[in-house]
Amino acid sequence: MKFLSYLLLGTFALTGCQATQRHNATTGQPETNSATKGVILGALAGAAAGAITGDDSKDRQRRALYGALGGAAVGGGVGYYFDKQEAELHNTLVNSGVQVQRLDENQLLLIMKNGIGFQSGSFALDSSIHQTLNGVAAVIARYPETKLVVNGHTDSSGNDTTNQVLSEQRAMQVESYLIGQSIKSGRIDAKGYGERHPICDNATIQGRACNRRVEIQILPM
Protein backbone atom coordinates (compact mmCIF):
# COMPACT_ATOMS: atom_id res chain seq x y z
CA MET A 1 0.00 0.00 0.00
CA LYS A 2 2.81 2.41 0.93
CA PHE A 3 4.55 1.59 -2.33
CA LEU A 4 1.45 2.38 -4.39
CA SER A 5 0.96 5.63 -2.48
CA TYR A 6 4.50 6.73 -3.29
CA LEU A 7 3.97 5.69 -6.90
CA LEU A 8 0.82 7.79 -7.28
CA LEU A 9 2.41 10.76 -5.53
CA GLY A 10 5.29 10.53 -7.96
CA THR A 11 3.08 10.50 -11.01
CA PHE A 12 1.12 13.53 -9.81
CA ALA A 13 4.34 15.37 -9.02
CA LEU A 14 5.68 14.61 -12.47
CA THR A 15 2.56 15.87 -14.21
CA GLY A 16 2.49 18.95 -11.99
CA CYS A 17 5.98 19.86 -13.13
CA GLN A 18 5.45 19.23 -16.83
CA ALA A 19 1.82 19.59 -17.82
CA THR A 20 0.30 22.70 -19.35
CA GLN A 21 -2.98 23.64 -17.64
CA ARG A 22 -6.01 23.50 -19.93
CA HIS A 23 -9.45 25.00 -19.39
CA ASN A 24 -12.79 23.91 -20.78
CA ALA A 25 -13.69 26.16 -23.73
CA THR A 26 -17.33 26.40 -22.61
CA THR A 27 -17.16 26.57 -18.80
CA GLY A 28 -13.68 27.99 -18.32
CA GLN A 29 -13.04 25.38 -15.62
CA PRO A 30 -9.63 23.66 -15.34
CA GLU A 31 -9.41 20.27 -17.03
CA THR A 32 -7.08 17.34 -16.54
CA ASN A 33 -4.84 17.60 -19.57
CA SER A 34 -3.59 14.84 -21.81
CA ALA A 35 -0.14 14.70 -20.27
CA THR A 36 -1.58 14.18 -16.80
CA LYS A 37 -3.94 11.45 -17.97
CA GLY A 38 -1.23 9.76 -20.01
CA VAL A 39 1.31 9.78 -17.20
CA ILE A 40 -1.12 8.37 -14.63
CA LEU A 41 -2.51 5.67 -16.91
CA GLY A 42 0.93 4.80 -18.24
CA ALA A 43 2.37 4.58 -14.74
CA LEU A 44 -0.41 2.34 -13.49
CA ALA A 45 -0.23 0.08 -16.53
CA GLY A 46 3.54 -0.14 -16.27
CA ALA A 47 3.35 -0.89 -12.56
CA ALA A 48 0.80 -3.63 -13.13
CA ALA A 49 2.89 -5.23 -15.86
CA GLY A 50 6.01 -5.09 -13.74
CA ALA A 51 4.30 -6.47 -10.65
CA ILE A 52 3.27 -9.72 -12.30
CA THR A 53 6.70 -10.53 -13.72
CA GLY A 54 8.79 -10.59 -10.53
CA ASP A 55 9.96 -13.76 -8.80
CA ASP A 56 9.23 -12.63 -5.24
CA SER A 57 7.68 -9.73 -3.34
CA LYS A 58 10.73 -7.45 -3.44
CA ASP A 59 11.44 -8.26 -7.07
CA ARG A 60 7.84 -7.54 -8.02
CA GLN A 61 7.96 -4.17 -6.26
CA ARG A 62 11.20 -3.28 -8.01
CA ARG A 63 9.82 -4.28 -11.41
CA ALA A 64 6.59 -2.42 -10.71
CA LEU A 65 8.55 0.75 -9.94
CA TYR A 66 10.58 0.50 -13.14
CA GLY A 67 7.44 -0.31 -15.11
CA ALA A 68 5.65 2.69 -13.62
CA LEU A 69 8.46 5.07 -14.51
CA GLY A 70 8.67 3.75 -18.07
CA GLY A 71 4.91 3.76 -18.51
CA ALA A 72 4.66 7.32 -17.20
CA ALA A 73 7.27 8.54 -19.67
CA VAL A 74 5.57 6.90 -22.64
CA GLY A 75 2.01 7.68 -21.55
CA GLY A 76 2.69 11.33 -20.87
CA GLY A 77 4.93 12.02 -23.82
CA VAL A 78 2.39 12.23 -26.65
CA GLY A 79 -0.25 13.95 -24.54
CA TYR A 80 2.24 16.55 -23.34
CA TYR A 81 3.38 17.11 -26.94
CA PHE A 82 -0.19 17.96 -27.98
CA ASP A 83 -0.87 20.00 -24.84
CA LYS A 84 2.08 22.25 -25.65
CA GLN A 85 1.14 22.52 -29.32
CA GLU A 86 -2.45 23.41 -28.43
CA ALA A 87 -1.31 26.13 -26.03
CA GLU A 88 0.99 27.66 -28.66
CA LEU A 89 -1.75 27.63 -31.28
CA HIS A 90 -4.21 29.31 -28.90
CA ASN A 91 -1.67 32.07 -28.22
CA THR A 92 -0.80 32.47 -31.90
CA LEU A 93 -4.38 32.54 -33.18
CA VAL A 94 -5.99 34.79 -30.56
CA ASN A 95 -8.28 37.36 -32.28
CA SER A 96 -7.61 35.74 -35.67
CA GLY A 97 -11.12 34.31 -36.11
CA VAL A 98 -9.65 30.80 -36.29
CA GLN A 99 -10.95 28.41 -33.65
CA VAL A 100 -8.70 25.86 -31.93
CA GLN A 101 -10.48 22.71 -30.76
CA ARG A 102 -9.21 19.59 -28.99
CA LEU A 103 -11.01 16.63 -30.60
CA ASP A 104 -9.39 13.98 -28.42
CA GLU A 105 -6.20 13.38 -26.47
CA ASN A 106 -3.97 13.47 -29.55
CA GLN A 107 -5.91 15.43 -32.17
CA LEU A 108 -6.39 19.16 -32.70
CA LEU A 109 -8.65 20.98 -35.14
CA LEU A 110 -8.27 24.51 -36.48
CA ILE A 111 -11.51 25.90 -37.96
CA MET A 112 -11.57 28.82 -40.41
CA LYS A 113 -15.32 29.58 -40.53
CA ASN A 114 -17.38 32.11 -42.48
CA GLY A 115 -15.24 31.81 -45.57
CA ILE A 116 -12.18 33.25 -43.78
CA GLY A 117 -9.40 33.56 -46.32
CA PHE A 118 -11.54 33.39 -49.47
CA GLN A 119 -13.86 35.63 -51.44
CA SER A 120 -17.34 34.26 -52.17
CA GLY A 121 -17.24 31.54 -54.83
CA SER A 122 -13.46 31.82 -55.20
CA PHE A 123 -10.65 29.44 -54.29
CA ALA A 124 -7.94 32.12 -54.46
CA LEU A 125 -6.39 32.54 -51.02
CA ASP A 126 -6.93 36.08 -49.74
CA SER A 127 -3.84 37.94 -48.54
CA SER A 128 -5.68 38.81 -45.31
CA ILE A 129 -5.19 35.23 -44.08
CA HIS A 130 -1.47 35.02 -44.85
CA GLN A 131 -0.30 36.25 -41.46
CA THR A 132 -2.58 33.79 -39.68
CA LEU A 133 -1.33 30.86 -41.74
CA ASN A 134 2.25 32.02 -41.22
CA GLY A 135 1.65 31.71 -37.48
CA VAL A 136 0.13 28.25 -37.88
CA ALA A 137 3.08 27.11 -39.98
CA ALA A 138 5.58 28.46 -37.46
CA VAL A 139 3.98 26.45 -34.65
CA ILE A 140 3.61 23.29 -36.73
CA ALA A 141 7.26 23.48 -37.77
CA ARG A 142 8.25 23.22 -34.10
CA TYR A 143 6.32 19.96 -33.74
CA PRO A 144 7.66 17.65 -36.48
CA GLU A 145 5.97 14.55 -35.05
CA THR A 146 2.55 15.74 -36.21
CA LYS A 147 0.86 15.70 -39.61
CA LEU A 148 -1.90 17.85 -41.11
CA VAL A 149 -5.06 17.16 -43.09
CA VAL A 150 -6.69 20.25 -44.63
CA ASN A 151 -10.44 19.76 -45.16
CA GLY A 152 -12.53 22.06 -47.34
CA HIS A 153 -16.31 22.48 -46.84
CA THR A 154 -19.05 24.55 -48.50
CA ASP A 155 -22.64 25.46 -47.74
CA SER A 156 -25.57 23.97 -49.68
CA SER A 157 -25.87 26.83 -52.19
CA GLY A 158 -25.15 25.85 -55.78
CA ASN A 159 -24.89 22.33 -57.19
CA ASP A 160 -23.08 19.37 -55.67
CA THR A 161 -20.37 19.17 -58.31
CA THR A 162 -19.44 22.84 -58.07
CA ASN A 163 -19.35 22.69 -54.29
CA GLN A 164 -17.19 19.57 -54.28
CA VAL A 165 -14.65 21.11 -56.65
CA LEU A 166 -14.60 24.41 -54.73
CA SER A 167 -14.02 22.65 -51.41
CA GLU A 168 -11.13 20.64 -52.87
CA GLN A 169 -9.55 23.72 -54.46
CA ARG A 170 -9.72 25.73 -51.23
CA ALA A 171 -8.19 22.90 -49.22
CA MET A 172 -5.39 22.57 -51.76
CA GLN A 173 -4.74 26.32 -51.68
CA VAL A 174 -4.23 26.22 -47.91
CA GLU A 175 -2.09 23.10 -48.26
CA SER A 176 0.06 24.77 -50.92
CA TYR A 177 0.51 27.91 -48.84
CA LEU A 178 1.62 25.95 -45.77
CA ILE A 179 4.08 23.96 -47.88
CA GLY A 180 5.43 27.30 -49.08
CA GLN A 181 6.01 28.17 -45.42
CA SER A 182 8.41 25.22 -45.02
CA ILE A 183 5.92 22.54 -43.96
CA LYS A 184 7.14 19.38 -45.70
CA SER A 185 4.71 18.04 -48.30
CA GLY A 186 4.90 14.58 -46.74
CA ARG A 187 3.33 15.94 -43.57
CA ILE A 188 0.22 17.44 -45.14
CA ASP A 189 -2.75 16.32 -47.23
CA ALA A 190 -5.84 18.10 -48.60
CA LYS A 191 -9.41 16.85 -48.99
CA GLY A 192 -12.70 18.39 -50.07
CA TYR A 193 -16.13 17.39 -48.80
CA GLY A 194 -18.39 19.86 -50.58
CA GLU A 195 -21.63 20.39 -48.65
CA ARG A 196 -21.71 16.89 -47.11
CA HIS A 197 -20.62 17.78 -43.56
CA PRO A 198 -22.50 20.88 -42.34
CA ILE A 199 -21.96 21.98 -38.75
CA CYS A 200 -24.68 24.67 -38.84
CA ASP A 201 -28.15 25.09 -40.35
CA ASN A 202 -27.97 25.79 -44.10
CA ALA A 203 -31.48 27.30 -43.93
CA THR A 204 -30.11 30.56 -42.49
CA ILE A 205 -27.58 33.10 -43.75
CA GLN A 206 -25.53 32.71 -40.59
CA GLY A 207 -25.65 28.93 -40.85
CA ARG A 208 -24.45 28.91 -44.44
CA ALA A 209 -21.60 31.25 -43.53
CA CYS A 210 -20.66 28.89 -40.70
CA ASN A 211 -20.57 25.92 -43.09
CA ARG A 212 -18.26 27.67 -45.55
CA ARG A 213 -15.04 26.72 -43.84
CA VAL A 214 -11.61 25.17 -44.06
CA GLU A 215 -10.44 22.93 -41.23
CA ILE A 216 -6.91 21.83 -40.42
CA GLN A 217 -6.64 18.56 -38.52
CA ILE A 218 -3.44 18.02 -36.54
CA LEU A 219 -2.66 14.36 -35.87
CA PRO A 220 0.26 12.21 -34.70
CA MET A 221 2.60 11.04 -37.45
Language-model-detected regions and their locations in the chain:
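Short, low-complexity, glycine-enriched hydrophobic/amphipathic alpha-helices that associate
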Residues: Q21-H90
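C-terminal motif of bacterial Sec signal peptides marking the signal peptidase cleavage site
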Residues: L14-G16
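Periplasmic OmpA-like peptidoglycan-binding domain that tethers envelope proteins to the cell wall
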Residues: N151-M221
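Amphipathic, membrane-active segments
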Residues: D83-M112
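Short, solvent-exposed beta-strand/turn patches at coil↔beta or beta↔helix junctions
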Residues: L103-N134, T154-T161
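Sec-dependent signal peptide recognition
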Residues: M1-L9
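Periplasmic peptidoglycan-binding/anchoring modules of Gram-negative envelope and division proteins
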Residues: F118-N151, I179, A209, I216-M221
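Stable alpha-helical elements in mature extracytoplasmic
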Residues: I40, L44-A48, Q85, L89, ...
